[in-house]
C-alpha cells in the first residue's frame, strides 16, 4: 500500500493494519525458520509496510 493511501486512513484503521502486518511477519518468519518459505522477498515487503504504517502513525500523533 502506498504512503498516500495510508495517510487517508484513520488511526484505528492504521493500528488494525499494523496488527495484521505483524501477524503476517510472524508467520513468514516461522516459515523461513522451518525452510518452508519459497518467496523470501515477502519478508522485506512486510517489514517495509510495517515501517510505512508506523511512520504515518507517528505523523498523525504529532499533528
Curated annotation (Swiss-Prot):
* GO MF annotations, alphabetized: structural constituent of ribosome
Task: Report keywords, A-Z.
Answer: Ribonucleoprotein, Ribosomal protein
* GO cellular component: a single term: cytosolic large ribosomal subunit
A Pfam family reported for this protein in Swiss-Prot or TrEMBL: Ribosomal_L29
**Record's keyword annotation contains DNA damage:** no
Q: Which InterPro entries match?
A: Ribosomal_protein_uL29, Ribosomal_uL29, Ribosomal_uL29_CS, Ribosomal_uL29_sf
Q: Does the keyword Transmembrane helix apply?
A: no
Q: Which GO terms describe its biological process?
A: translation
Provide the family line. Answer: Belongs to the universal ribosomal protein uL29 family.
| HAMAP family assigned | Ribosomal_uL29
Q: Know the name of this protein?
A: Large ribosomal subunit protein uL29
Organism the protein comes from:
Histophilus somni (strain 2336) (Haemophilus somnus)
Q: Lineage in the entry?
A: Bacteria, Pseudomonadati, Pseudomonadota, Gammaproteobacteria, Pasteurellales
Q: Which gene is transcribed and translated to give this protein? A: rpmC
